Amino acid sequence: MDDLKQKYLSQIAAAQDEAGLEAIRLAAVGKKGEVALKMRELGKMTPEERQVAGPALNALKDEINSALAAKKAGLADAALDARLRDEWLDVTLPARGRPRGTIHPVSQVTEEVTAIFGEMGFSVAEGPRIDTDWYNFDALNIPGHHPARAEMDTFYMTRAEGDDRPPHVLRTHTSPVQIRTMEAQGAPLRIICPGGVYRADYDQTHTPMFHQVEGLAIDKDISMANLKWVLEEFFAAFFEIDGIKTRFRASHFPFTEPSAEVDIQCSWIDGQLRIGEGDDWLEVLGSGMVHPKVLAAGGIDPDQWQGFAFGMGIDRIAMLKYGIPDLRAFFDSDLRWLRHYGFASLDQPTLHGGLSR
């Protein structure tokens, strides 16, 4: 019995793999193994012999099975160690790069404009893109015969046959937001109104849908001098040019009186626009003192309050600042264009941290 025990325990200890270990198990404790054959011989023994041999064989079988299990676990651990050595991963290596999206220039410039005017105390106001012609035209002192109300310039919403109510329009500017905010908040007031607007025009510098930001400030003693200061501060911060020169030219808008178009100093060198230098001028926005009729339409007494307003194209000033040649490309959804002109998602513009890259 001891010889049999030593034989198989030594074979188990010397086994190199699970296949060899299984062969030893079958030879030792399998149905036709040596221990099983010894068990069958118990029937030929006397009772006294069986009382001695039976427990010894069971103990041998248990010991061999324990040795087999321990060896199998050891082989599995060794195989795992070998696999880990062969397939190890250096966790200090940089991760594989993931495709990253970019912030559209319109979104970025909107955030830049909001940050600048936010430092001056302006809050953001928003309103519907589909509005009544009263908010879009009448409340802004734009009469029925004005060219802007023609179907060739404005997108009108059709009504069901027999519905005689005034038509809705896709707003042609964000000025209706000013009227709604005056109605809701009264005076004093200091807001900017960024958002999408719609006009029936399409060429290199015009698209049927584009983006505007308009500003409105109403108080007791506001004047054109305040308007001039606000716009010059904005241009200096937005274009990041100290002392940028501006020029106010008399103009006419139905909703402001007096009205002025505002130009900024620029030059053209080898076909490249340079802002803040040279002897040329570039128109960038319209502005003026809010017309008394517009204040009255917003529920504000023009004898007690006055204010200034201005408006500019977000897409246009984005083109000027970042050298984008064609407005239509803003809406083409071209990933190559977006990767080139887009901004990192964490580029949050602030006056103190920097507006642009």
Curated annotation (Swiss-Prot):
Task: Read off the InterPro entries from this record.
Answer: aa-tRNA-synth_II, aa-tRNA-synth_II/BPL/LPL, Phe-tRNA-synth_IIc_asu, Phe-tRNA_ligase_II_N, Phe_tRNA_ligase_alpha1_bac, Phenylalanyl-tRNA_Synthase, tRNA-bd_arm
Q: Which GO terms describe its molecular function?
A: ATP binding; magnesium ion binding; phenylalanine-tRNA ligase activity; tRNA binding
A single GO cellular-component term from the record reads: cytoplasm
Task: Report the record's Gene Ontology biological process terms.
Answer: phenylalanyl-tRNA aminoacylation
Q: Which UniProt keywords apply?
A: Aminoacyl-tRNA synthetase, ATP-binding, Cytoplasm, Ligase, Magnesium, Metal-binding, Nucleotide-binding, Protein biosynthesis
Instruction: Tell me its cofactors.
Output: Mg(2+)
Coarse class of the primary localization is cytoplasm
The record's similarity note reads:
Belongs to the class-II aminoacyl-tRNA synthetase family. Phe-tRNA synthetase alpha subunit type 1 subfamily.
Family annotation (HAMAP family): Phe_tRNA_synth_alpha1
This one is known as Phenylalanine--tRNA ligase alpha subunit
Species: Roseobacter denitrificans (strain ATCC 33942 / OCh 114)
Gene behind the chain: pheS
